[in-house]
A protein has these predicted regions:
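Hydrophobic anchor at the beta1->P-loop junction of P-loop NTPases
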Residues: 24
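Conserved phosphate-donor/acceptor-positioning beta-strand/loop module used by diverse small-molecule
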Residues: 123-124, 140-160
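Conserved substrate/cofactor phosphate-moiety recognition/catalytic segment
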Residues: 37-98
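Conserved glycine(s) of the Walker
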Residues: 31
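The conserved Walker
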Residues: 28
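NTP-dependent small-molecule kinase module
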Residues: 2-3, 188-276
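Glycine-rich phosphate-binding loop used to anchor ATP phosphates in small-molecule kinases
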Residues: 83-141
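Extreme N-terminal, non-catalytic leader segments
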Residues: 2-21
């Protein structure tokens, strides 16, 4: 009886699909976009029941830059500085906070109706990731995974120049040496991100400890293996969680059905006794 209920739960798909969020963090040129491309390739090959959606803050920043370029005539009020290769530097870093808030809205809108197993890859670069991640709502960060890709400044700069010279993707945009050596010089990584609950200022809510670090200093093959291994661990964990959830729902349903059956039998017995 119990396993029949479990089978019914699985066939009916009683567990709702909840997208899994993966934040991919690191300096420009560290390998974030390359990591996404490998994630997408690996999932298509090895986990065909999953799909991947990619979000970056750069698209929003670029839209803001283009709008300012044509409509903000007052040079002093401009928040972006045009650079070579159709790139730009951020002059007013407050826009970086605004962009992340807008990014959350964009993601929530796009993934409001999920009909399969889905991995949401969210990519951005900052100097202080603890501060940046606190701009997202706690519910949005709940159960998310975090991948920080580490690479030294000189390597990042060289990769940026190489990708601009030999562009093969829309993600191959230019970032100036100046901004990499100044704003992105330090990388603060929150291995334990905490937020004060404003309804109770004495309470601290732990948001996540799921921060994984990969050093992208070796060969492309080595980097690929690290990415595949990490993604496989995420999917394995999520599928185990889903199986546990389905079993829990089945047990609850079985218990409910069992009580109804017993109640029905007792009622029939009582009616029989009254008639006698």
């Amino acid at each position: 009886m119990l396993w029949a209920v479990v089978g019914h739960s699985i066939s009916k798909g009683t567990t709702n699909f909840v997208p899994v969020k993966l934040f991919v963090l690191g300096r420009p040129g560290s390998g974030k976009s390359e990591a996404y491309r490998q994630i997408d390739k690996y999932i298509q090959q090895s986990h065909k029941n999953w799909s991947v959606i990619h979000f970056t803050d750069y698209e929003i920043l670029q839209e803001m830059f283009q709008f300012e370029k044509y409509f903000q005539l007052n040079e002093k009020l401009r928040k972006f500085q045009p650079r070579e290769h159709e790139g730009f530097d951020v002059r007013d870093f407050s826009v970086l906070d605004d962009v992340l808030k807008e990014l959350e809205k964009k993601i929530r809108f796009r993934v409001s109706n999920v009909c399969n197993e889905q991995l949401i890859v969210i990519e951005f670069a900052r100097d202080d990731y603890g501060k940046a991640l606190k701009l997202f709502s706690p519910n949005f960060l709940k159960d998310a995974y975090f991948l920080f890709i580490n690479s030294d400044i000189n390597t990042c700069i060289q990769r940026v120049h190489d990708r601009v010279a030999h562009s093969s993707s829309i993600d191959d945009h230019f970032v100036s040496d100046d901004i990499i050596c100044s704003y992105y010089k330090r990388q603060r990584i929150p291995f334990k991100l905490e937020r004060v609950d404003f309804l109770n200022s004495n309470k601290v809510q732990v948001i996540t400890t799921k921060m994984h670090l990969i050093n992208n200093k070796g060969s492309q093959q080595d980097f690929t293996k690290k990415i595949n291994r990490f993604i496989n661990s995420i999917i394995k964990h999520e599928e185990q969680e889903k199986s546990s959830s389905i079993l829990g729902e089945a047990l609850t349903q079985w218990g409910h059905n069992h009580i109804l059956v017993r109640a029905s039998k007792l009622r029939m017995r009582a009616v029989s006794l009254l008639r006698n």
